[in-house]
């Protein structure tokens, strides 16, 4: 009995020892692989050395590449490393792994290169993809086509679409819609229409997406006539335009009227909104913001305020964007009191704008030389506790000091340091002996006007002095008068 117990204890001890050995060995291997991974990431992400140096350094690392390692390295380095270094690392991995790499790794790297908009790197990898008979998935093609069109290579995007079968990727509803969307995103609508007519049979079920893309493309070109025709084609096909379609038409119309007919902005936009309601589609704050943005660019102050009030009456609550466009045009046209009043109204209604709202408007006020109003708006920003005050301090302190208000500039500097805000501007700005004080632009313009007027008066006086006096010629007697005298 005792010998049996001893044997059992011995077996248990040996089993536990074996488990501990395996545990420590596995942890040692994990540590080694983690170290190798970090070393590869360091080499790939290093900005020092060329591409040949990169490959040479990778060869010196004692690491066995794997699909998982490739994905991890690319994911870790994609944001801060140049696409060419990522491509060279992937090529080095392909040499080591060969057919062990799956199609999904090729597609992943191609999507990363497309996101980084490196046309040459994309072409190299697409060529490798085709040589090795790899399959490109539909999502990858969509991203590649969109990127190529963005960088002005729409012909390349169409070329890849035509030979999708060589990438084992079908020309189905998804890929046809993707190439049409990519082309229309930069206004190449005629090319998109060509693709659409050649593949009518495969876009069945995706008609709404295709019409949306066409409308967006015509809005990029500001072609209201063609955009209207697309809406009519949708009605003829029994497809009801949605909010996106009407907003695209509204954008097209408003952008065209900014340059051609600013006074027609409001009536024509309201007609489109009336048409939207006939389809039981209520205009949203985004619809109104399209109009408000264009009204602001044309400095239509009264219409901007009226549209804001109309939004409230119609039950469409303005958002922070609506208030921003109206306040901005008020500040730019010198209606500072009215602008501040609308900001207060927005805060009272419970809106909590993001820091960009305040930062942009403070920039506008500084640009029109109204730093006192900018300081008031900054106080409202601090009361709302949105954070991100560093940029505002960096804007206001130089503006105050260069305007001669060193006392207020120093006060803001000390305030920023007290709340641990890191400033980018130099402390030398607070020194009047170093910082040059600029006169306001209006004073300079007025002085220039006075100088111009004085110069014009001098020129006219000089011309009057040198101008020779002309003797008036005696009037000739008419023939009738001579005859009368003779009689």
From Swiss-Prot:
PPR repeats: 137-171, 172-202, 207-241, 242-283, 284-318, 319-353, 354-388, 389-423
Cell location: Mitochondrion
Pfam families tied to this protein: PPR, PPR_2
InterPro entries xrefs: Pentatricopeptide_rpt, TPR-like_helical_dom_sf
Keywords recorded for this protein, A-Z: Mitochondrion, Repeat, Transit peptide
Gene3D superfamilies recorded: Tetratricopeptide repeat domain
Keyword Transit peptide: yes
GO cellular component, as recorded: mitochondrion
Region (Disordered): 466-487
Annotated organelle transit peptide span: 1-90
Family: Belongs to the PPR family. P subfamily.
Protein name: Pentatricopeptide repeat-containing protein At5g61370, mitochondrial
Natural source organism: Arabidopsis thaliana (Mouse-ear cress)
